């Protein structure tokens, strides 16, 4: 890629952060703080708003959007879609549960649209693990059935649903980008996309994270950045220089969201160090 194209890609990449880091903070204060630290977007975990997204009124969703816009901050979308819920399962043999799960994903997509978001990240490992007696092939059939039914409506809403491969330590279904892409190809809907994640892709054994980015990021719908130590970029041993260089070289021009799991350094300090690391890496990627 030429230097001018790399600069264009960097200019298009926007930096966001996931809101669950700001535990028990007022939503307005989260938005103001995130914006003051230099982020352009906020990615929301539904469980931080209500036990279920359907518990929120239309008025409350519109209010949250207005609060973000006043910051000013974009709502990127939703992630941790099924976390801390009960009764939903993607790969269960029970057709009624699969239908209920699909219906809830549609409700999440509608909430994303109202919030002004553009994507949802489907990780939720505990709602896709293989149940006893269910094979990988059967799980693929069940998941494909759910997505084939709901993706036309999600697409009409203008929302991308991004499938997140996760490490074998987290789930036994969809562990690699290649596996996720096979399911995406099977469903064959333009709004069903791959999600990439530094921690998750670090568990893949056949290629490095930069190599996986080179291979898969051109068609990816979203990207999460964190260290394998569960803290933010720049707070561990992961070198984000090659990662962001590969991302820029791939032509990826979407959001990069900071997603962390170890909150102990504090929300503001984590957010501050993370964006500083990502900006340094992006600046270096165009030199």
Protein language model features and the residues they cover:
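Short hydrophobic interaction/assembly module
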Residues: 61-83, 87
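Residue-level detector of anion-binding/catalytic polar loops
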Residues: 40-41, 74, 118, 160, ...
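Active-site-proximal loop/turn and secondary-structure-junction residues that shape catalytic pockets
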Residues: 21-23, 46-48, 81-84, 126-128, ...
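Residue-level preference for long, well-ordered alpha-helices that form the structural scaffold
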Residues: 53, 57-60, 94-101, 135-139, ...
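Histidine-acidic metal/acid-base catalytic patches
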Residues: 2-38, 65, 69, 116, ...
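Active-site acidic/histidine proton-transfer and metal-coordination neighborhood
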Residues: 28-29, 67-70, 87-193, 203
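Glycine-rich, proline-tolerant flexible connector loops at the mouths of alpha/beta enzymes
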Residues: 45-65, 124, 131
């Amino acid at each position: 890629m030429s230097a001018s194209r790399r600069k264009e890609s960097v200019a298009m990449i926007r930096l966001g952060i996931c809101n669950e880091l700001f535990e028990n903070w007022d939503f307005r204060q989260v938005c103001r703080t995130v914006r003051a630290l230099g982020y352009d977007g906020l990615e929301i975990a539904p469980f931080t708003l209500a036990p279920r997204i359907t518990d929120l009124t239309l008025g409350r969703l519109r209010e949250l959007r207005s609060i973000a816009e006043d910051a000013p901050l974009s709502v990127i979308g939703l992630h941790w879609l099924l976390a801390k819920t009960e009764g939903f399962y993607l790969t269960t043999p029970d057709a009624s549960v699969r239908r209920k799960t699909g219906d809830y994903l549609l409700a999440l997509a509608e909430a994303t649209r109202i919030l002004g978001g553009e994507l949802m990240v489907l990780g939720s490992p505990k709602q896709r693990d293989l149940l006893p007696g269910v094979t990988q092939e059967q799980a693929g059939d069940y998941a494909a059935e759910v997505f084939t039914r709901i993706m036309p409506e999600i697409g009409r809403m203008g929302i991308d649903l991004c499938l997140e491969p996760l490490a074998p330590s987290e789930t036994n279904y969809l562990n690699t980008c290649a596996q996720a892409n096979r399911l995406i190809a099977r469903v064959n809907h333009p709004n069903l996309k791959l999600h990439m994640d530094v921690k998750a892709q670090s568990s893949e054994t056949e290629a490095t994270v930069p190599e996986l980015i080179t291979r898969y990021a051109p068609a990816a719908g979203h990207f999460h950045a964190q260290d394998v130590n569960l803290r933010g970029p720049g707070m561990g041993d992961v070198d984000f220089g090659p990662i962001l260089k590969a991302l820029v070289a791939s032509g990826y021009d979407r959001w990069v969201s900071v997603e962390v799991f170890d909150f102990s350094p504090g929300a503001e300090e984590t957010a501050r160090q993370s964006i500083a690391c990502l900006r340094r890496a992006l600046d270096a990627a165009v030199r």
